UniProtKB/Swiss-Prot annotation:
Chain's gene name: alaS
Organism: Xanthomonas euvesicatoria pv. vesicatoria (strain 85-10)
Listed name of the protein: Alanine--tRNA ligase
InterPro entries tied to this protein: aa-tRNA-synth_II/BPL/LPL, Ala-tRNA-lgiase_IIc, Ala-tRNA-ligase_IIc_anticod-bd, Ala-tRNA-synth_IIc_core, Ala-tRNA-synth_IIc_N, Ala-tRNA_ligase, Ala_tRNA_ligase_euk/bac, DHHA1_dom
Domain remarks in the Swiss-Prot or TrEMBL record: Consists of three domains; the N-terminal catalytic domain, the editing domain and the C-terminal C-Ala domain. The editing domain removes incorrectly charged amino acids, while the C-Ala domain, along with tRNA(Ala), serves as a bridge to cooperatively bring together the editing and aminoacylation centers thus stimulating deacylation of misacylated tRNAs.
Pfam families, per the entry: DHHA1, tRNA-synt_2c, tRNA_SAD
NCBIfam families: alaS
One BP term from GO: negative regulation of DNA-templated transcription
Key word Aminoacyl-tRNA synthetase present: yes
GO terms assigned for molecular function: alanine-tRNA ligase activity; aminoacyl-tRNA deacylase activity; ATP binding; tRNA binding; zinc ion binding
Residue sites binding Zn(2+) per the record: H570, H574, C672, H676
Length: 882
């Protein structure tokens, strides 16, 4: 029996932060699991991620000492523990990292002293159960442990380089091949000699006896490209301690899944699944995965088929499959959320705020996967039964493509059965699909600027925020048929680059401007403006008169009416984005947009279709902000200042040091380089025209604004009036009259079905009397006018009951088409197959069909061939009966 827990997980968090706050540290909130402003990293996987730019010197903080509890995820990319989760004592997808930091303030002496004080005096860990490692040349750290702390040399282990490579050591940390780096010292807890395993550095170090609990990294060098280490002028400290591992030690248990937090989650999973064995690995998987999935959704990730969303989907579906293994066939995973909120909501208030969003997103994914999970498992069983120890890559791909099984889920199932997946074959099938998609997506017209031309040009100066036309625009480059030229003539299709321009180049979803460029004796009709190499505005158009050469100076003016309509739609997308987040939740993130003169299209993350009420509320909120006539403010500022200002940045986007912030009253603040109205009232009216799904987890709204919205409303009103006239009433009566018509139609359809049934019943009696005896089997093969497939099946059922041993073919003719049903009943079923018979008939009338041995369906063309085919049925049956 384990000893009672001395420190709860919540208390450990609080103790850690209180201790370091008492040592002059600023307590910093956890960063999201999605790293801000760093597209190179899939997820926050360690405590230092949010401080990366501080260590690199790219960011300054208002403090030099910090402490935090960082939520982390390792389930994709380089750091991926997913396969091991649930099957080992300490692997998790989601975990919490306790950390304290010094940015050029204290160093080794204080870091080591405070770590020892917290462990042995606050948490009362026995000193003789602790062991430390140091980098083999770090004499300073070795001496501090021995002389200041008093640890015997026998419990201080020097760790060298792996395979002799310089600084390639578990005890030497480096961010990259160059940059900040330094030695580290690690603190281990000895679980006792009753647990297998040896101390770090020994051949048995991978055992579970000695568990690392705290890593203190001393960043004291700047690694140069040639590998030399230059001392940093202000050394830093970065420490990390896994909360779950520490809790296991302080609660006197050996595995992380035995701590209070996990036991509560496992208990809830047990209650939901009916499994009472709390050691069950599937319960552990479910308990682990609910944390990862919930916090990913809190941080704006939703299940999808790409990127972070696909990692989330993989984790959810792994949990659902483990529930399926336990016999659960109804949604259960989303019901774990309230328990998680009770356990972690105090530490992470954002989880409480997003509780409903998290539960709804998980439930939607449960319902979606439930449709294919059972069928997919049957396919896996079939594949496994005909394979020996390898699941073919093509079959793994089919499970992925058709049934939504992530390949690591298939590999998980295979591993449980002593099998493995042919990953090479799977990747081959995936690549073939990608090639097909690439081929389908190819289009002409792509033009790239030559590298030498890019090197010779300066970025285009955009004047279009303040001006719609400008003079003295110097031609700095000219493309014709995609190639640089020095001169072009009237009639030539060209792309003109000038040093400055009032023309907006397509970006951020906003279409490029059109208009005119002109100079002495030359005129160019500009139909589009595109951005090249991210910084050069190319005016796409045709020279209508004269000739154009490099160095020419032009005047330019945009189509102001087109721009005017476009800016209404662009500003409306900002209000729409804010309204969506207000109504649906902060999980809503922009996934794409189109801002054109005639409409706007906005793609965003959301996990389920809208209700009519939700759409109406969103539309009302946007129009309320339009009527409020807020002034639209533009601010240029540093990226961090913009985030502090409350500006919303898009996940995964990489922004420069300075950004443009657009603020609309107190309702919307976003980073944006597009063109906009000066007041929200300029938008006039906002009207949603459609809403639908784009892909899994992504919805799309299309809308119109200004005069376009008024025209749309007028068209809708005209259609309503037309409907009212057709119904013989006024517009207020349309709904009631349509409802009455619908009810009448349903009643007439029921009466029609009843009449059809009576007709079929009467026809069946006549058909039975016309049956032909073929070797003791009744054979019926007839054409029935006006019978659809359902009426044919009903007639078939009655004939089978009436005739006993029989072979029946019924052909329902209507509108030049024929529906076919073939049935075999009683003794003939061993020799006569309905599917073969129906295929034989269908082939004669230009059709096809098939089915079971006792019942088959198909169709074809009506005509003389049908009578011939039906007349031949008795002979065909006789031949097959022998």
């Amino acid at each position: 029996m384990n000893a009672p827990a001395k420190f709860s997980t919540s208390q450990i968090r609080s103790d850690f932060l209180a201790f370091f706050e008492g040592k002059g540290h600023t307590i910093v909130p956890s960063a999201p699991l999605v790293p801000g402003n760093d597209p190179t990293l899939l997820f926050t996987n360690s405590g230092m991620v949010q401080f990366k730019d501080v260590f690199l010197g790219a960011e300054k903080r208002s403090y030099v000492r910090a402490a935090d509890v960082q939520r982390c995820l390792r389930a994709g990319g380089k750091h991926n523990d997913l396969d091991s989760v649930g099957y080992t004592a300490r692997h998790h997808t989601f975990f919490e990292m306790l950390g304290n930091w010094s940015f050029g303030d204290y160093f080794k002496k204080d870091a080591i002293a405070w770590a020892w004080e917290l462990l042995t005096q606050v948490w009362k860990l026995p000193a003789d159960r602790l062991l430390v490692t140091v980098y083999h040349t770090d004499e300073e750290a070795f001496a501090l442990w021995r002389d200041m702390i008093g640890i015997p040399e026998s419990r201080i282990v020097r760790i060298g380089d792996n395979k002799g490579a310089p600084y390639a050591s578990d005890n030497f940390w480096q961010m990259a091949d160059t940059g900040p780096c330094g030695p580290c010292t690690e603190i281990f807890f000895d679980h006792g000699d009753h647990i297998a395993g040896g101390p770090p550095g020994s051949p048995d170090e991978d055992g579970d006896r000695f568990i690392e609990i705290w890593n203190l990294v001393f960043m004291q060098f700047d690694r140069q490209p040639d590998g030399t280490l230059v001392p940093l002028p202000a050394p830093c400290v970065d420490t990390g301690m896994g909360l779950e591992r520490l809790a296991a030690i302080l609660q006197h248990v050996h595995t992380n899944y035995e701590i209070d937090l996990f036991q509560a989650l496992i208990g809830k999973a047990s209650a939901l699944t009916g499994i009472t064995d709390l050691e069950n690995k599937s319960l552990r998987v479910i308990a682990d995965h609910i944390r990862a999935c919930s916090f990913l959704i809190v941080d704006g990730v939703l299940p999808s088929n790409e990127g972070r969303g696909y990692v989330l989907r993989r984790i959810i579906r792994r949990a659902l499959r483990h529930g399926w293994m336990l016999g659960v066939r109804q949604p259960f995973f989303s019901k774990m959320v309230p328990t998680l909120v009770e356990l972690m909501g105090e530490a992470y208030p954002e989880l409480v705020v997003a509780q409903d969003t998290v539960a709804r997103a998980l439930l939607a994914e449960e319902e979606r996967f439930a449709e294919t999970l059972d069928a997919g498992m049957k396919i896996f069983d079939e594949v496994a039964s005909r394979s020996q120890d390898i699941i073919p890559g093509a079959d793994a791909f089919r499970l992925y493509d058709t049934y939504g099984f992530p390949v690591d889920l298939t590999a998980d199932i295979a591993r449980e059965r002593g099998m493995r997946v042919d990953m090479e074959g799977f990747e081959f099938a995936m690549e073939r699909q990608r090639e097909t998609a690439r081929a389908a997506g190819k289009f002409g017209g792509g033009v790239a600027l030559p590298a030498d031309l890019v090197a010779s040009m300066s970025p285009t100066v955009f004047l279009g925020y303040e001006a719609y036309d400008a003079d003295a625009l110097k031609v700095v480059a000219l493309l014709k048929q995609g190639r640089p030229v020095e001169r072009a003539e009237a009639g030539d299709e060209v792309i003109v680059f000038t040093d400055r321009t009032p023309f907006y180049a397509e970006s951020g979803g906003q279409v490029g401007d059109s208009g005119q460029l002109s100079g002495p004796g030359v005129s160019i009709n500009v139909t589009d403006t595109q951005k090249f190499a991210g910084q050069f505005h190319g005016h796409v158009g045709r020279i209508s008169e004269g000739a154009l050469a490099l160095g020419d100076v032009l005047a330019g003016g945009i189509d102001t009416q087109r721009r005017g309509k476009t800016i209404l739609n662009h500003s409306a997308t900002h209000l729409l984005h804010a309204a969506l987040r207000e109504v649906l939740g902060t999980h809503v993130q922009q996934k794409g947009s189109l801002v054109a003169p005639d409409r706007l299209r906005f793609d965003f993350s959301h996990f389920q279709p809208f209700t009519a009420d939700e759409l109406a509320v969103i539309e009302r909120k946007v129009n309320a902000e339009v009527r409020a006539n807020h002034g639209v403010e533009v601010h240029n500022m540093a990226m961090q200042e913009a985030l502090d200002f409350g500006a919303m940045a898009l996940f995964g986007e990489k922004y420069g040091e300075n950004v443009r912030v657009l603020k609309m009253g107190g309702y919307s603040t976003e980073l944006c380089g597009g063109t906009h109205v000066t007041r929200t009232g300029d938008i006039g009216l906002f009207k949603i025209t459609s809403e639908g799904g784009v892909s899994s987890g992504v919805r799309r709204i299309e809308a119109v604004t200004g005069q376009g919205a008024l025209d749309y409303v007028a068209d809708e009103e005209r259609r309503l009036l037309e409907a009212a006239n057709l119904l013989g009433g006024n517009t207020s009566e349309v709904v009631d009259k349509v409802r009455a018509l619908t009810e009448r139609q349903k009643r007439l359809e029921r009466e029609l079905e009843s009449l059809k049934a009576k007709l079929a019943s009467g026809a069946t009696a006549d058909l039975g009397a016309s049956a032909i005896d073929v070797v003791g089997v009744k054979v019926v093969a007839v054409r029935l006018e006006g019978f659809d497939a359902k009426a044919l099946r009903d007639a078939m059922d009655r004939l089978k009951q009436q005739l006993g041993d029989s072979v029946i073919v019924l052909a329902g003719a209507s509108g030049g088409k024929v529906a076919l049903v073939a049935g075999v009943n009683g003794s003939p079923t061993g020799k006569v197959k309905a599917g073969e018979l129906l295929g034989h008939i269908a082939s004669q009338i230009g059709g096809k069909g098939g089915g079971r041995p006792d019942l088959a369906q198909g169709g074809g063309e009506d005509g003389p061939a049908l009578a011939t085919a039906l007349d031949g049925v008795p002979l065909w049956v006789k031949q097959h009966l022998g």
